[in-house]
Amino acid sequence: MGNLTMSRRTFVKTAAITGAAAAAFGASTHTALAEETYSSVSGNDTVAVKTCCRGCGKMECGVKVIVQNGRAIRVEGDEGAFQSMGNCCTKSQSSIQAAYHPDRLHYPMKRTNPKGEEPGWQRISWDEAMQSIVDNFMDIKAKHGGEAIACQVGTSRIWCMHSESILKNMLETPNNVEAWQICKGPRHFATTMVSQFAMSWMETITRPKVYVQWGGASELSNYDDSCRTTVDVASRADVHISVDPRMANMGKEADYWQHLRPGTDGALALAWTNVIIEKKLYDELYVKKWTNAPFLVCEDMEPSGFPTVRTDGSYWDVKTALLKESDIKEGGSPYKFLVYDNNWEKLKAEGVEHEYGAFTWFNADQEGVIDETGGFWEGENYDSEKARQGREAAQDNLLPGQTQGWLPDPMPFDPAIDPALEGEFEITLKDGKTVKVKPVWEHYKARAAEYKPEVAAEITGIPASEIEAAATAYGTRIDPSTGYGNGGIQYMLAVEHFCSAIQNCSAFDNLVGITGNMDTPGGNRGPTIVPIDGDLQGFSAWAPGATTPPEEVNRKQIGIDKFPLLGWWQYWCDSHSLWDAVITGDPYPVRALWNESGNFMSQTNTTRAWEALCSLDFYVDLNLWHTPQNDTADIILPVAHWIELNSPRASQGSAGAMGATVKCVQPPAEAKYDPEIVMDLARRMNWKWTDEPGNEWPDINWQLDDSIKLLTDDELTYTTWHVENGKPTFERHGVPMAEVTPKYKTWDEYVKAFQEHGWWQAKDIEPRNWGTYRRYQTGAMRARDRVWGRLDYTAGKGIGDWKPGWFTPTMKQEIWSTVMESHHPDHPEWRLPTYTEPPHGPKDGDRIKEYPLTATTGRRIPVYFHSEHRQLPWCRELWPVPRVEINPKTAAEYGIEQGDWVWIETEWGKIREVADLYYGVKEDVINLEHTWWYPEVKDAGHGWQFSQVNQLIDHYAQDPHSGTSNLRAYQVKIYKATPENSPFNNPVPCDSTGTPIIHTSDDPRLKEWLPTYEGRE
């Protein structure tokens, strides 16, 4: 591999002696914080700017950017950032190399050569670029409709992710290709369906007693609590369980390693569920009161239901076999779900009598369509303030100064009903027919029994005794006095990359719930809630006063016919179907694309996606770099790096941190901030962003000021409920949205406070909401709108009803999914979590003869974030080539040695990667690296064809609900790359001239990528 020759110290030394200070750009925007500070310093004095790192797209690590004379010279960890503990990983430190890279895009460009060839980029002005975009979009829209223009976005740098989303409204298109479809999206999709949006996020930062790390290596990179935090959490846990097909870095330290076959996560989750149920390790009160486990299933009647709200606010019809009052009584409510009360006779003797004898009901009429008792049980007594009674949480290993949070005591039923979880009961329907009904729990119990440890062992390859031991360790409370479980499950990206993505995530959500780990300390809590909601800042996510497309536009979304639940979800179109539509024109032509940080290599078969990109009439790409994808663009626009921009920021997950990404230095030359570009497009298209006369297209200063105005010392509006004998009353409290006094009048004031205070704890900012656990009990789970939790300052929108429960059709965590049942009536097996074998896996007897090895992929690499950083010299020097991990015994069978280039092949494509012999993968499994390309290759596409793993996948192997690509657990064959079987007689990939890629750490081309400080004016 050669010797490492370029150290971080070498670069810092170079940075100190090279070039002049970067010049200012864009007088209309906030100046870089460091520049303002320089008025009082001189010479070699430096400023440390607190900010939020975006070296990867996941973790909100607090860092300091060290700026000297207008130039950023290094990034270091912020020890005061409680969520990241001063962590500063290799990607973060290398951000300086990205910001000052000689290959950064500085100016708008247009292509001059045909697509599929080297683009022949020509510099143009911003005015020419933007006018060309408007003209082409309007022409295509006039010919084919807004749906002929698609939007694409990558992962969560929020300023591009949500700027792109508003473009859907602007262009009136339902079609957006999202990395979200294969990255966190299936988790968010599934949890929205069965509990609450993004309840997959786990509060690892409060250090659970049992830490379950499922399908990821967050000790290396990514996810809300990663790197140093993950190591600390795992080290302090009483029990650490790692579930992974390969031995991850922290896996070797785990108490239990569940070494499963790739793609069998769902079977293992159901096996754990079986153990939990059979050993009665579940939280009985939670299961009975806050899930639909006691609701009764009637399989001898036609499903019926009621209209309820989609994620976008439109309506759809629930059709369910769950027994309702309307099924047993003419004129009865379809919202009242019946349960059998084991205590009915005792209560009757005490003078509490149910309307239907042994059966009582829960009313899920959350919008008060029929009566006011929605959200409550028959005859219930409930008081919001009593629901909050409890104590401060008592997690053992919090960092000094970290807020514990308020833990309400579990609230028993009042009156003391006892909903049955088991049994079979007779009831007479309104047509006079007597039927037998069973609780959902009976069906769930039977489903889990299909995957008891002995069965799951055959599927997963893990011994049954080890499955039972790990599940028991997770479910058995180490300290029962806490009143909650040992912790949630940090299930990560791997579980989403199969045709069972949604079912996998539903299985985890239910498992967390029944063990008493939903919204509890160290449990799964969902996205952090704070008033600024940095993940959804106003200027990049929504446009107050702007118009939204009519509902019929959303009904045109590509892929909705193949995946009906996309019509319920509505946050992405199916990427596979979109690329097909570009090529075939079916179901209608898609002729243009707007892309902000999206990457065609992340999902679908890459070869098919490339064909589609080359077929577009017009394509605009916003980026920092020349990339494989934008080699097919017609116009590319240069954008700012994270150290060159301002953005509010809160933890996307459960870490509970609030801060900011702060502009440290000016962007180079003519690079602009994504929201400014989108706003300019809106102005040129006469699409009004606000309804404020004279400020229809506000500048970035106004938008930033607007983004923090709900941060206040006032208590925001909330509602308390008092229910007596089933009769509810409510009272509003706090200050209405439009009347709050902002704590900081301007963005600059907020940033100044952030520099002085550091990261705030959301538990302190919103004590009734994020600062309180068991929000399903207090009503705070429904305090904000049903998906994003967005607050609309001007209209007071986004405020929920504060009723206890969840935002599901039944207002319960749904073990039996009414959403799935309603959209897939012909698949009764999908109503409960289930397991499906991966297509093209080892159970495919015909294929395994030719393709004997199971491929997995997607692991975290310390120096890269998916496709990013391949041109950063520190990173590429440390990890110059893609590696395929092969068990040494397997490698010996194929005559492969450490460092050999290896061909990996399926019937859909073949690639080359370098052998890395590792006993941490099983003998019949190989582990491939993903999204590789070679910036040094100047041919169109920058050599993505050489090693990009998704060339190997079946384009049409998808999850039947979300459309997610089956990216892992498929069969491949391997053989050593030799001069005889390689182009140019070279096992190392070469460009069209025969020049090899950079494949050693001492390649002199790496030095050509060292930072430059010239040409930024």
From Swiss-Prot:
Gene3D superfamilies: 2.40.40.20, 3.40.50.740, ADC-like domains, Dimethylsulfoxide Reductase, domain 2. InterPro entries: Asp_de-COase-like_dom_sf (IPR009010), MopB_CT_Acetylene-hydratase (IPR037949), MoPterin_dinucl-bd_dom (IPR006657), Mopterin_OxRdtase (IPR006656), Mopterin_OxRdtase_4Fe-4S_dom (IPR006963), Prok_Mopterin_Oxidored (IPR050612), TAT_signal (IPR006311). Its cofactor is [4Fe-4S] cluster; Mo-bis(molybdopterin guanine dinucleotide). Keywords: 4Fe-4S, Iron, Iron-sulfur, Metal-binding, Molybdenum, Oxidoreductase, Signal. Pfam families: Molybdop_Fe4S4, Molybdopterin, Molydop_binding. It is an enzyme of class 1 (oxidoreductase). It comes from Eggerthella lenta (strain ATCC 25559 / DSM 2243 / CCUG 17323 / JCM 9979 / KCTC 3265 / NCTC 11813 / VPI 0255 / 1899 B) (Eubacterium lentum). This is Uncharacterized oxidoreductase Elen_0471. Residues 45-103 form the 4Fe-4S Mo/W bis-MGD-type domain.
